[in-house]
Design a protein with these regions (language model features):
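Glycine-rich loops and low-complexity Gly/Arg-rich segments
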Residues: 35-39, 61-65, 87-90, 106-110, ...
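Compositionally biased amphipathic helical and low-complexity segments enriched in hydrophobic
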Residues: 71-74, 78, 93, 117, ...
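RNA substrate-binding interface of SAM-dependent RNA methyltransferases
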Residues: 1-89
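Structured adenosyl-cofactor binding patch, chiefly the S-adenosyl-L-methionine
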Residues: 30-32, 43-60, 113-157
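Active-site/ligand-binding-proximal alpha/beta "capping" segment
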Residues: 82-131
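Weak global preference for isoleucine
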Residues: 16, 25, 37, 52, ...
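Intrinsically disordered, low-complexity regions enriched in small/polar residues
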Residues: 4-5, 11, 49, 62, ...
């Protein structure tokens, strides 16, 4: 498996169950110019027809690893690892380094406690009070494009 420290935004997906969500996340990740995706044991199948349909086949342009031990991967990465949850600094206020990893969790349970402990910082997406949470695909899009806004799009202006 890939354990070097390639450049860019590394997406770590913890037990994502819905193929539609996974497809949307992959499509967004590729659209923002990113390459690396790591799926934990328990994630839905990267190659299922519904994931391929939802991603529009973008997993063919990504470097994807399935059945990964994300805790071991985090131990080997040499850059910041963020998690997304309900508490923490707003992702919109955080100045990112170009090379980061971001953990997104299961649709119902969120990120496992093991991975939360390994995260350098939890960030949140600001929402009005009567909205409990966002769909993981929507949340991923916000995080991915905030990182892209700070690097990819600034460099191309």
């Amino acid at each position: 498996p890939y354990y070097s420290n390639g450049a860019g935004f590394h997406l770590l997906l913890d037990d994502i169950q819905d193929p539609g969500n996974l497809g949307a996340i992959l499509r967004t990740h590729a659209a923002a110019g990113n390459k690396f995706v790591f799926l934990s044991k328990g994630c839905c199948d990267l190659w299922s027809p519904k994931v391929i349909r939802g991603s529009q086949g973008t997993q063919f342009s990504l470097i994807c690893y399935q059945q990964e031990d994300l805790a071991l991967l985090i131990d080997r990465l040499e850059f910041s690892v963020f998690s997304l949850g309900m508490q923490g600094e707003s992702v919109l206020n955080r100045k990112f380094d170009q090379n980061i990893a971001f953990i997104l969790g299961n649709e119902g349970r969120g990120i496992s406690s093991t991975l939360l402990k390994k995260s350098d910082q939890m960030l949140s997406i600001p929402m009005i009070k009567n909205v409990e949470s966002l769909n993981v695909g929507v949340a991923a899009s916000i995080v991915i494009y905030e990182h892209a806004r700070q690097f990819l799009f600034q460099q191309s202006l």
